[in-house]
Amino acid sequence: MSKRDFYEVLGVGRDASEREIKKAYKRLAMKFHPDRNPGNKEAEASFKEVKEAYEILTDGDKKAAYDQFGHAGVDPNRGGGGFGGGADFGDVFGDVFGDIFGGGRRGGQRQAARGSDLRYNLELSLEEAVRGLTKELRIPTLAACDACDGSGAKKGSSPTTCGTCHGQGQVQMRQGFFAVQQACPTCHGRGKIIKDPCNKCHGEGRVEKSKTLSVKIPAGVDTGDRIRLSGEGEAGEYGAPPGDLYVQVSVREHAIFQRDGNNLYCEVPISFSKAALGGEIEVPTLDGKVNLKIPAETQTGRMFRMRGKGVKSVRSHAVGDLLCKVVMETPVNLNERQKELLREFEDTLTGQSKKHSPKAEGFFDGVKKFFQDLNS
């Protein structure tokens, strides 16, 4: 009977992280454990299958061989060999089989893995991003077990030397005339075995935990910026260095301002009379309202630049500008008197539209030329 795919056994994808694989294993191991299913042969077989899949997929060397060659890559009996002692053939065949069996090591036990890096997505308002602030972040992570100080062994005990590999972390596997090294299947390449595991972390040396960090967000950050906090990732295996935490910044859209680099943009409505006669209008900035002088005969869509009213660069002392686009609004809900005044004003423009409407002049001249060209 052929073996099932190890990823299928654990119910995880081929891109699953080691943490996801461990979670799946713990859940299935509890489900099929013989103590919970006394006398159930099917559950016992499933438990062994789950255990084998876990041992392969959490060992870097075996996982690499399995991903490349399937079950044949991790079968110790393939080629009539097996595990055993003897001379160290790693120097001779390490370069040949290194890629297959995760080689490159000239003997010696596998180093405990550095902790995984973590990513935290932080959403900020535009005001927070521009001014900077300190944020309290709650981070779910794997922390070193405080009951065993990350060793995985119960207090008062310590890991013992593996009897299979004699502390080397590797064993010989024979392939016909060849012999190659791979991680010891008993200790998973560590060279030591925990016979009396810690009750709190169950020999893992790490426990799931949430921690709170106070993170300073510098002024001027923008969407896509990343803040690295060294050593604040997951704890490493059995005392290995921790990973890092990366805070990924995104900035929410603002109701008034749009940001482009260090510059801010906004649209400011102005009345018809203000655009024609000129005057001062109030313009919003992130520091409060300021007055902007509008010259007479301002056309809708004109852009005004207010220097130094943008965003301070997070990488230098440069400060961007605020660009205000004025948009002339057509008056609504007019009373009869106001309508009458507008009609009188319109009458005064009769025959003088070119003089008072420069854009209209250009438009109608263009229309006239279009029809002339069409009929020529």
From Swiss-Prot:
Annotated residues for binding of Zn(2+) 1: 145, 148, 198, 201
Sequence ranges assigned to domain J in this UniProt record: 5-70
Broad class of the protein's primary localization: cytoplasm
MF term (GO), any: heat shock protein binding
Keywords per UniProt: Chaperone, Cytoplasm, DNA replication, Metal-binding, Repeat, Stress response, Zinc, Zinc-finger
Cofactor(s) in the UniProt record: Zn(2+)
PROSITE patterns referenced in this protein's UniProt entry, alphabetically: DNAJ_1, DNAJ_2, ZF_CR
Cofactor details (free text): Binds 2 Zn(2+) ions per monomer.
GO BP term, pick one: chaperone cofactor-dependent protein refolding
The keyword Repeat is assigned to this record: yes
Chain positions of CXXCXGXG motif repeats: 145-152, 162-169, 184-191, 198-205
Binding residues annotated for Zn(2+) 2, in chain numbering: 162, 165, 184, 187
Location of the protein in the cell: Cytoplasm
Zinc finger regions, CR-type: 132-210
A GO CC term assigned to this protein in UniProt: cytoplasm
HAMAP family (UniProt xref): DnaJ (MF_01152)
Assembly with partners or alone: Homodimer.
Record remark on domains: The J domain is necessary and sufficient to stimulate DnaK ATPase activity. Zinc center 1 plays an important role in the autonomous, DnaK-independent chaperone activity of DnaJ. Zinc center 2 is essential for interaction with DnaK and for DnaJ activity.
Family: Belongs to the DnaJ family.
Function: Participates actively in the response to hyperosmotic and heat shock by preventing the aggregation of stress-denatured proteins and by disaggregating proteins, also in an autonomous, DnaK-independent fashion. Unfolded proteins bind initially to DnaJ; upon interaction with the DnaJ-bound protein, DnaK hydrolyzes its bound ATP, resulting in the formation of a stable complex. GrpE releases ADP from DnaK; ATP binding to DnaK triggers the release of the substrate protein, thus completing the reaction cycle.
Name of the protein described by the UniProt record: Chaperone protein DnaJ
